[in-house]
Amino acid sequence: MKIAVDVMGGDRAPDEILKGALLASKELESEIVLVGPREIVENAGLSFVETTEVVNMDDPPLEVLRKKDSSMHVGLKLVAEGKVDAFVSAGATGPLFLGATSIVGKIKGVERPALGVAVPSLKGFTVLIDAGANAKVRPEHLLDFSLMGIAYARVLGVESPRVGLLNIGSEENKGHEDLRKAFSLLKEHLGDNFYGNVEGHDINLGTVHVVVTDGFSGNVALKTMEGTAKLITSVMKESIKEGGLFSLIGAFLMKKSFDRMRERLDPRTYGGTFILGIRGIVVKAHGSSDAKAIRHAIRVAERGIRMNLVREIERGIPHVRNSGDGR
């Protein structure tokens, strides 16, 4: 397995990206292929592909197609040509998403690819889709998202994933017209796999395995979770310091438990987001990713390769297309 890494993507590129790639190369079986300027990548001790251009974080999406020798464009092309099995980038979402759909290409039957991420819940994880790619969607897009989310959850070991539609209430008649139409579509096509409407708190409670929503709401939910996780760890640290000697002793005795909790809540450990619905494995890392986050994103990419994520989505989409939904 080969995983290409965009050395120039992200707010902390190239240093943190290189560190993360090196960490991953020591832990994973996959060969890591760095994509970036020769002067930056040639002495890292890993395979590399030289590029001369950069898609900047504030570049408009079309720049990924114009800058054909950028690390992002070249990395996506490596996936499209089968020269690597996956590509990881912390670059800007807009260019990466457009590049993935245009260069790697969409799976037949998928109109709108989406960002899917597994976030921690009380029952293990919840797949959130769309996590930020499509701000406005139609009801049929949410059906596609649910099918891709089911495939992702199966890859993660859930035999019969249950799907919830993110809404402002659990009742069937809640939300605007498009959400009510989406509810009917999911109920018709998913059958027993459709749980119904869920609310924001259900994401981390693990009420369902897959939460489907538009990219605007999904991204707000994801960023809120990230902020809440940071708040919890910060408040705990402050409370321990303010509690005096006995609090410090108690914290020392519970250090392993606290470390496990902090690791589980750390946004860097679930920051690798698949672009689902394309004909290859592309993982979007957070723009502010440090080495730990990049290492995890590469690990996510390897998991997608091992579990044949693309094939699972390809298997899940056609049966709905042929079931008379009229599209």
Swiss-Prot record:
Pathway: Lipid metabolism; phospholipid metabolism. Its EC number is 2.3.1.274. It catalyses: a fatty acyl-[ACP] + phosphate = an acyl phosphate + holo-[ACP]. It comes from the Bacteria. Homodimer. Probably interacts with PlsY. Belongs to the PlsX family. This is Phosphate acyltransferase. The gene is plsX.
